[in-house]
């Protein structure tokens, strides 16, 4: 009975009608992902400029890998540490720290200076980009967990996907800002190019900084307060404010629930209940990030090889022209492929289901990458570079309307509240290890692009197989998925707690 009484307050959250606050939360939580995606692509542009300014041509291969991959190295400890802190200290208490660190690191990256030019400046830049990666990594489990615990069960997938879709806007913004800055400096003296890369890097901090105040005002999620902190009064107060529903708390119910299901991470009971789930989320995220990040980071190498981009030389104006061309191609792929993929996931994830979309995504990525790899010599021989770009864009469409989004959604739903942020952090950290493998493991891709594509196809097939370990979470309450509390057995599934209705009491 206690479980049913407690679940009434969570049931009210599960069936709540979509309100303005949900959309505000999407924007607040999504700004970290805007900066993440902005940084991912903009650093590829910046690498060309750094090569021209400090190496009079192209960055050495090892330095290029360090500049582009060091932030990914920072995301691994960021996800593990902040994911764990999110469960131990509360989602809100550490949420502002990640955003503040993100803003400071972005600005400091653009302000990197040294007494001696060249390698010293690169070292300073890498230092601040590592901490930028830590902040971005910490934002993953916290944003996903907060959005999953705020949302109703009917549209929960769409809300989490919408937060993640801010990556698409960050990706697009990187291309647009890159084109604007490149065009602005095109007719300036060569010495002023040093300002261009700094402006590009620092711009990503602006949207995140604008949402810091609102992030600090967000209340702790009711699920954390009720199920982990066992503070029924505060949970009732916070939920009343969010849903415009008056809730009467009962501390005795919370105390009784506090003694239920207290198994720890990696205990026998956890492995029995969720071991295969964690294996599925980690492996799928790992192989997805090997593919997704390597295709992003090495896009310019691949496009140069097929003739879409001019090759680098020591001429200043050629460097900027290459940047303009690169950003134009990337913006085209974002608008026609990547961004629509995010939108399709938001629209269909609560209709089709997370697992089906992930399976479809891995399958179609494999198909289009086979279309790139098998006739690769034909793409080169016939100079069909625009057809190659279309196939490349379709690969990104099904990555985003597929595992790139669903690997972010699923870990935020299928683990118990007291371990949710930690497990999401573990899944994401393993994923980012895959991203590091993708960046540092394919340093010579321009010489073996066909082999590179076939390796990524193998990663897609592994992801498809391990997706079969994951449960479908569409339309289910978080507590039903995790088994924390017995399923609430009322017949009013179709009822809604609406913002416009009079305030009433839901017993706790």
From Swiss-Prot:
- Principal localisation: membrane
Question: What highest taxon heads this organism's lineage?
Answer: Eukaryota
Q: Pfam families under this entry?
A: Sugar_tr
Q: Which residue ranges does the entry give as Cytoplasmic-facing topology?
A: 1-22, 86-93, 139-159, 214-277, 350-354, 411-424, 472-508
Q: Which UniProt keywords apply?
A: Membrane, Phosphate transport, Symport, Transmembrane, Transmembrane helix, Transport
Q: Kindly report every residue range on the membrane side named Extracellular.
A: 44-64, 115-117, 181-192, 299-328, 376-389, 446-450
Tell me yes or no: is Nucleotidyltransferase among this UniProt entry's keywords.
no
Quote the subcellular location field of this record: Membrane
The keyword Membrane is assigned to this record = yes
Q: Name one GO cellular component term.
A: membrane
What kind of membrane protein is this, topologically?
Answer: Multi-pass membrane protein
BP-aspect Gene Ontology terms: phosphate ion transport
Additional information? Although related to the sugar transporter family, it does not transport sugars.
The free-text function statement in the UniProt record for this protein reads: High-affinity transporter for external inorganic phosphate.
Question: Which family does the record claim for this protein?
Answer: Belongs to the major facilitator superfamily. Phosphate:H(+) symporter (TC 2.A.1.9) family.
Q: What is this protein called?
A: Putative inorganic phosphate transporter 1-13
């Amino acid at each position: 009975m206690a479980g049913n009484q407690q679940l009434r307050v969570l049931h009210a959250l599960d069936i709540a009608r979509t309100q303005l606050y949900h959309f505000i939360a999407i924007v607040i939580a999504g700004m970290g992902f805007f900066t993440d995606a902005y940084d991912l692509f903009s650093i590829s542009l910046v690498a060309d400029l750094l090569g021209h300014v400090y190496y009079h041509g192209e960055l050495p291969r090892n330095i290029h890998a360090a500049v582009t991959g060091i932030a990914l190295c920072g995301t691994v400890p960021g996800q593990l540490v902040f994911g764990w802190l999110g469960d131990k200290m509360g989602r809100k208490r550490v949420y502002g720290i990640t955003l503040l660190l993100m803003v400071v690191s972005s600005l400091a990256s653009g302000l990197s200076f040294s007494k001696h030019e060249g390698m010293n400046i690169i070292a300073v830049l890498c230092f601040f980009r590592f901490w930028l990666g830590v902040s971005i990594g910490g934002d993953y489990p916290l944003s996903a967990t907060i959005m999953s615990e705020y949302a109703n069960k009917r549209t929960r997938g769409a809300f989490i996907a919408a937060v993640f879709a801010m990556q698409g806007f960050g990706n697009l913004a990187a291309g647009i800002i890159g084109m604007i800055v490149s065009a602005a400096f095109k007719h300036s003296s060569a010495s002023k190019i040093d300002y261009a890369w700094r402006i590009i890097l620092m711009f990503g901090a602006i949207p995140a900084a604008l949402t810091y105040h609102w992030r600090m005002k967000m209340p702790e999620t009711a699920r954390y307060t009720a199920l982990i902190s066992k503070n029924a009064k505060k949970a009732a107060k916070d939920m009343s404010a969010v849903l415009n529903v008056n809730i009467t708390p009962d501390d005795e119910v919370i105390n009784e629930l506090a003694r239920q299901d207290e198994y720890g991470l990696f205990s026998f009971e956890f492995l029995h209940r969720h071991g295969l789930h964690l294996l599925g989320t980690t492996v799928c995220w790992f192989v997805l990030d090997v593919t997704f990040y390597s295709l992003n980071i090495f896009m310019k190498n691949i496009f140069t090889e097929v003739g879409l981009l001019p090759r680098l030389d020591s001429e200043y104006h050629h460097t900027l022209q290459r940047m303009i061309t690169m950003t134009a191609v990337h913006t085209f792929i974002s608008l026609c492929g990547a961004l629509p993929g995010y939108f399709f996931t938001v629209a269909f994830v609560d209709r089709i289901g997370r697992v089906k979309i992930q399976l479809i995504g891995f399958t179609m990525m494999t198909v289009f990458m086979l279309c790139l790899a098998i006739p690769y010599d034909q793409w080169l021989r016939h100079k069909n570079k625009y057809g190659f770009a279309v196939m490349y864009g379709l690969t990104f469409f099904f990555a985003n309307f597929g595992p790139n989004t669903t690997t972010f959604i699923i870990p935020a739903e299928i683990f118990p509240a007291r371990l949710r942020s930690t497990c999401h952090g573990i899944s994401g950290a393993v994923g980012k290890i895959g991203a590091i493998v993708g960046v540092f493991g394919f340093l010579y891709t321009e010489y073996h692009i066909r082999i590179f594509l076939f390796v990524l196809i193998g990663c897609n097939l592994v992801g498809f197989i391990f997706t079969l370990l994951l449960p479908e979470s569409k339309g289910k309450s978080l507590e039903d998925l995790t088994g924390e509390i017995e399923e609430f057995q009322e017949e009013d599934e179709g009822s809604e707690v609406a913002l416009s209705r009079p305030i009433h009491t839901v017993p706790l």
